Amino acid sequence: MNVNPDVVKNANQAKWAPAVLSGWGMHAYYGESYIVQGINFNVHEGEILALLGRNGAGKTSTLRSIARTGSPMVTQGEIWLDHQPLHKMESHEAAAAGLGLVPEDRRIIPGLTVEENLQLAQIAPPIGWSIERLYDLFPRLGERRKQEGVTLSGGEQQMLAIARALARDIKVLLLDEPYEGLAPVIVDEIEKTLIHIKEQGM
């Protein structure tokens, strides 16, 4: 596996920053079967952290448990976001507390243009990056702002999903399989953009 040296350097620097997302003794299950058992973690401000594992290892379940989005839910342990107890929240409360999630299926809304997808994300506070700033971050989206979101390429849909998350005022951004099925040139473009986002203070 190739690792971008900038990611390693930035992650090492971030270890000295305060933890913004933490979990202790985290368990989650489907039915009677545990999918996630005894996970502990700290994610620091300015850190890019990756979950690595085979298919079925529980990566998506871990992210969904942190974000409180459906089953499985955490049944034991604690998750804290900037001193706020995520383990006591519903998904909409976690989002309002500053947790952003880009799911693997991206969930681009049919019938809405790129711009309308972003506007919908800002229909209620807390509002994050302005739409024009997001177009500066993702020029491809600015060029296609009037195009229906679901007609974009896979890579452009992923950019839209990330931009939509940033349209909210978030402290942590979780990405589930962000590069799955994308061309290497798009992966490189998104990776560089994520590093730029981190350098802007996330």
Describe every region a protein language model picked out.
Residues 2-202:
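Glycine-rich phosphate-binding loops of nucleotide-dependent enzymes
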